[in-house]
Amino acid sequence: MSLVTVGIGDLAVTGDPRAVIVTHGLGSCIALVAWDPGLRVGGMLHFQLPASALSPERALDAPGTFADTGIPLLFHRLYARGCRKEALVVKAAGGGSFNDRGGAFDIGRRNHAAMWRILRHARVAVVAEDVGGSRSRTVRLFLDSGRVTVQSGDQVAPL
């Protein structure tokens, strides 16, 4: 097994069947996972904020930080590996809320809304998601099978 760790604002794409792509500590951030079962190529993005307009300079240095720059980059890299949009199995997890202020301060909800807006516009379907709540998550994508798990504490569940 080859472990590929995706940090905050980062992404990874691989076709190594021995690889497991993992990201830890998802709070309000969202992990977007995509896997092509025919090619056995997959990727994961761990984005932190909904819009690059918040920091255009940071978007240039770390486009994976933002939904509006990271999501297109993830799909661009998957397409560069031969993946086709209609073949991709796309899943998402994270987007939690950890304060009672709501509104503009509810980054998890804003991240989730931005993700859906971008994916709808691109006509990309999400087949499963585990979002919201107030728990931290670890997400794993197993490249040999496309299996995605979400771990919160000691509980591991398929997505």
UniProtKB/Swiss-Prot annotation:
Gene: cheD2
High-level lineage: Bacteria, Pseudomonadati, Myxococcota, Myxococcia, Myxococcales
Similarity field: Belongs to the CheD family.
Catalytic activity as recorded in UniProt: L-glutaminyl-[protein] + H2O = L-glutamyl-[protein] + NH4(+)
Pfam families reported for this sequence: CheD
SUPFAM superfamilies on file: CNF1/YfiH-like putative cysteine hydrolases (SSF64438)
Its job: Probably deamidates glutamine residues to glutamate on methyl-accepting chemotaxis receptors (MCPs), playing an important role in chemotaxis.
InterPro entries recorded: CheD-like_sf (IPR038592), Chemorcpt_Glu_NH3ase_CheD (IPR005659), Cytotoxic_necrot_fac-like_cat (IPR011324)
PANTHER family in the record: CHEMORECEPTOR GLUTAMINE DEAMIDASE CHED-RELATED (PTHR35147:SF1)
Residue spans crossing the bilayer: none
Statement: the UniProt record of this protein carries the keyword Cytoplasm: no
GO MF annotation terms: protein-glutamine glutaminase activity
Domain of life: Bacteria
Single GO biological process annotation from the record: chemotaxis
Name of the protein this chain belongs to: Probable chemoreceptor glutamine deamidase CheD 2
Keywords: Chemotaxis, Hydrolase
Enzyme class label: hydrolase
Tagged with keyword Hydrolase: yes
EC annotation from Swiss-Prot or TrEMBL: 3.5.1.44
